[in-house]
Amino acid sequence: MQGVYPAIITPLKENKVDYDGLRNNIDFLIENGVSGVIPVGTTGESPTLTPLEHEKVVEKVVEFVDGRVEVIAGTGSNSTSEALEFSQYAEDVGVDGVLLITPYYNKPTQEGLKRHFGEIANSINVPIVLYNVPSRTALNIEPETIKYLFNEYSNISAVKEANPNLSQVSEVLDSCDIDILSGNDELTLPIISLGGKGVVSVIANIAPKEFVQMVDFANAGKFDKAKEIHYKLFPLMKLMFVETNPIPIKTAMNMLGMPSGELRLPLCEMAESNKLKLQNALNNLGLLK
């Protein structure tokens, strides 16, 4: 895996999934050069989608993409059997891979993680991207565990690494050849400089062309050019997490007239003070017309 993989939002209209809007957003991203799309992850509000909505969104994304780029579906859960079942469903409807978050809340041991991911890997054939996000799960996939999983299971091929500690990335890449994608827009360039391949991006939902250019420059070793884009987008990157994701990105997309819609509780609208900051950042980048 290499390049920019937007973690796409799930657009809503009157509290129902807006599939026409979803198609439009996907076409926009593909036209601007992304390597793939990642539906029903954190940014896609997966915790508040019903199981049927979750499945239908994945099915529709595969249909709308129609083989033009990769589809890596979020299929993780803190229940191994549930994650396995949804991963099998996603494979059946034609995804190119699955993204499996570390089980949250029940906080398994590293041995439990090995068994959790291993059981799923043995049950599907498509590539698996491990998703390490300790800030949400209160659990880190230790480098030794990642090394074990990569060496033991041929379809565990990548990690979305959202641990801000770059020592983690260094330790992983020093021990095995697994592909690492940054799980944090702000850390994309540092992670690529250490040997990472790209990013699962939030900001790419609204600035895909620029982010693809930045990552392409970085992967080609042209870091001076990549840094120019990084610093141009950096204020907006920070604002994407001024409140809980996906509140800022959905707010920005609404401001830009893109299909986005409301959020589902317990997420709610952005504070007015933060909306103003976001509006100013979009204006400064020339994104607001």
Swiss-Prot record:
Q: Is the keyword Transmembrane in the record?
A: no
One Pfam family in the UniProt entry: DHDPS
Q: Which residues form the active site?
A: Y131, K160
Residue numbers for the site described as Part of a proton relay during catalysis? Answer: T42, Y105
Q: Where does this one sit in the cell?
A: Cytoplasm
Q: Which GO terms describe its biological process?
A: diaminopimelate biosynthetic process; lysine biosynthetic process via diaminopimelate
Q: Give me the Gene Ontology terms describing cellular component.
A: cytoplasm
* Enzyme kind, highest EC tier: lyase
Listed InterPro entries? Aldolase_TIM (IPR013785), DapA (IPR005263), DapA-like (IPR002220), Schiff_base-form_aldolases_AS (IPR020625), Schiff_base-form_aldolases_CS (IPR020624)
Its UniProt entry gives the catalysed reaction(s) as: L-aspartate 4-semialdehyde + pyruvate = (2S,4S)-4-hydroxy-2,3,4,5-tetrahydrodipicolinate + H2O + H(+)
UniProtKB keywords: Amino-acid biosynthesis, Cytoplasm, Diaminopimelate biosynthesis, Lyase, Lysine biosynthesis, Schiff base
User: According to the UniProt entry, what is the EC number of this protein?
Assistant: 4.3.3.7
**Binding positions (pyruvate):** T43, V200
Its Gene Ontology molecular function terms? 2-dehydro-3-deoxy-phosphogluconate aldolase activity; 4-hydroxy-tetrahydrodipicolinate synthase activity
Is the keyword Amino-acid biosynthesis assigned to this protein? yes
Predominantly, its location class is cytoplasm
Pathway participation:
Amino-acid biosynthesis; L-lysine biosynthesis via DAP pathway; (S)-tetrahydrodipicolinate from L-aspartate: step 3/4
Assembly information from the UniProt record: Homotetramer; dimer of dimers.
Q: Which family does it belong to?
A: Belongs to the DapA family.
Task: Describe its function.
Answer: Catalyzes the condensation of (S)-aspartate-beta-semialdehyde [(S)-ASA] and pyruvate to 4-hydroxy-tetrahydrodipicolinate (HTPA).
This one is known as 4-hydroxy-tetrahydrodipicolinate synthase
User: Organism source for this protein?
Assistant: Methanococcus maripaludis (strain DSM 14266 / JCM 13030 / NBRC 101832 / S2 / LL)
